[in-house]
Amino acid sequence: MGCVTFEVRLQTRWLDFDGLGHLNHAVYHVYLDEARDDALRRTVGDFASFPNVVVHASIDYKKEIAYGAREVVVQSTIAKVGRSSVRFRQVVLTPDGEVAAESESVLVAWDPAARSSRTIGDDERRALLAGGSGEVS
């Protein structure tokens, strides 16, 4: 099964840029989170349908996004579906389509009542795999 790439375009705001005139490092996490939420909505439904918590997030910054950029593009791929976790690989692109950052994150399915992780259900797994690489553990 091939990977499905979910793409979202996000508008930048004046406050997203720092005093050095580039997109602030912390804002990347916000953009990546919005893009992951979009990918999950398109596979398993909204957050209420698939409560989750982020247990890992890493970003490698490759290229500056300078003040004046009106939007960025975030591409998200579901790289792996585990027993209770989903691994995402994401890239943030400059307005010119160059890779500005690469990210990997792991989300864990969450049971709000028990306040703990839970096993990903069969229907959820099928939906995630349909939007992902097909790699299961």
Task: Place the predicted regions along the sequence by residue.
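Terminal targeting signals and extreme-terminal segments of soluble enzymes
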Residues: 1-73, 79-137
